[in-house]
Amino acid sequence: MEYNTSELCDMYIDVVDVVEPMFSNYGGCSSFGGAISTVKCFEDNGLIADALQEDGEGKVLLVDGGGSLRRALIDASIAQIAVNNNWEGIIVYGSVRDVDALEELDLGIQALASIPVGAEGNGVGEIELPVNFGGVTFLPGDHIYADNTGVILSPEPLDID
């Protein structure tokens, strides 16, 4: 499904929170949305890989990577796990790598930057907890919508029709 965050803001400005502009699109889908699952980790993507093993239909994985630009939390192999399990997208408050491969995938991916250095895979971090960045608090189960213009958050799914 295609989402236009500008139109959604016009229709639901009193309902949505707008995330501060900081993300760039790295995936093959320019717009995506769904109910969020959260992971909080720092320079370690083991829990991300584990979370993406679950059925992701209608869901977006929101990763609070502490804003680190030193290690990429998402690479082509982790993103492929998301595709294989039907995730709508991944939003990373951190970095990605393998950007040429990421843009070929049928997956929305937004992140702060790219860097060639990979993350540790020890599984250090937390899952399904509230996280805060970009001026917004994200709760598991909230609904997020992203496109090339921006990222917005709603406590309930928005009527797109």
UniProtKB/Swiss-Prot annotation:
Subcellular location: Cytoplasm
Membrane-spanning ranges: none
Cellular compartments per GO CC: cytoplasm
Membrane keyword on record: no
Keyword Metal-binding: no
Homology family: Belongs to the RraA family.
Subunit-level organization: Homotrimer. Binds to both RNA-binding sites in the C-terminal region of Rne and to RhlB.
Name of this chain's protein: Regulator of ribonuclease activity A
Organism of derivation: Shewanella denitrificans (strain OS217 / ATCC BAA-1090 / DSM 15013)
